[in-house]
A protein has these predicted regions:
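Extended surface/linker regions that mediate inter-domain or inter-protein docking
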Residues: 117-184
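Bacterial N-terminal signal peptides
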Residues: 18-31
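Conserved non-transmembrane functional hotspots
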Residues: 271-276
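N-terminal secretory signal peptides that target proteins for export/translocation
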Residues: 1-15
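The canonical Cys-X-X-Cys-His
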Residues: 62, 80-90, 146, 182-198, ...
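Extracytoplasmic electron-transfer domains, predominantly the class I c-type cytochrome c fold
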Residues: 54-61, 65, 93-136, 146, ...
Length: 276
């Protein structure tokens, strides 16, 4: 029997098919599960695509308000933070609560509110809680500018499509926090930027180079980042700066268990949260 006849025999072809199928299944099983099968992988918009005229002006203003919030919206910010302190990369970084795709995701049911809310309501949630400030009018120039920026970020994404990296990475909520271990991790890994007392590093202009994690200029008790596992999920994927991913899930849970329990501004309206 010639080599070619061996390779073309039914038994050889069947064996080859089984091997190929096995290899394919191995690849599929080992591939990282980024999101649902119909999720889209977004590409970041290039600023050269911002149009000229009023629409482009609104997009640029929106980005400025979201990245320099304390200085540009002093009447609506009650602490030293900017929106981009948590929404990293001007709202483009995966697993740092990016704004990419949000235009098509809202209205959305929020368990904390116990109802369907608009994106404008979600923005105001952040202003009142994370920024310890005041809500914007839905028809204000500033709100419309923020919406314009988020719409531009989402330009290539069909409404309703799952977005890989939306929100924060999932973390095992069965992990038990140890605040004493967390205090040691904070001192070793976090204090250089956020301060030994969580006070942050001032920028000399009333804001912060690195934001405070507790105290009067930090997010209030109603903010998502004041919730233990939300903070741990953010830390796990994004901190420390320049060493993201260097902490284990347990370390992230421990350090979040430490800093979320420190004193911060109150938010009386939080008694109405999670109504269902």
């Amino acid at each position: 029997m010639t080599p070619s006849s061996v390779f073309n025999s039914p038994s050889c072809r069947a064996t080859g098919a089984r091997v190929l199928l096995s290899m394919l299944m191995t690849v599929l099983m080992c591939a990282p599960a980024l999101a649902e099968p119909d999720a889209v992988v977004y590409k970041l918009q290039d600023e050269s695509t911002i149009p000229s005229g009023p629409e482009g002006d609104a997009i640029r203003l929106g980005k400025m308000l979201l990245t320099d919030t304390r200085r540009k919206l002093p009447q609506h910010v009650g602490n030293g933070l900017n929106c981009s302190n948590c929404h990293l990369g001007a709202g483009t970084q995966p697993h740092a609560s990016p704004w990419v795709g949000l235009i098509g995701a809202f209205p959305e049911y929020r368990a904390r509110s116990g109802k369907l809310i608009s994106l404008q309501e979600r923005i105001n949630d952040c202003l009142e809680r994370s920024m310890n400030g005041k809500a914007l009018a839905f028809d204000s120039v500033e709100m419309n500018a923020m919406m314009s920026y988020m719409r531009w970020l989402s330009a290539d994404i069909a409404p309703g499509k799952p977005i890989p990296g939306r929100g924060f990475v999932k973390i095992d909520t069965r992990l038990k926090p140890d605040a004493s271990r967390g205090e040691k991790i904070y001192a070793a890994k976090c204090a250089a930027c956020h301060g030994a007392e969580g006070q942050g590093v001032p920028d000399g202009a009333g804001g912060y180079v690195f934001p405070p994690l507790w105290g009067k200029d930090a997010f209030n008790v109603g903010a998502g980042m004041a919730r233990h596992f939300t903070a741990a999920a953010f830390v796990l994927k994004n901190m420390p700066v320049g060493q993201a991913g260097s902490l284990s899930a347990q370390e992230a849970v421990d350090v979040a268990g430490y800093f979320t329990q420190q004193p911060r501004p109150d938010f009386p309206a939080s008694v109405k949260d999670w109504p269902n």
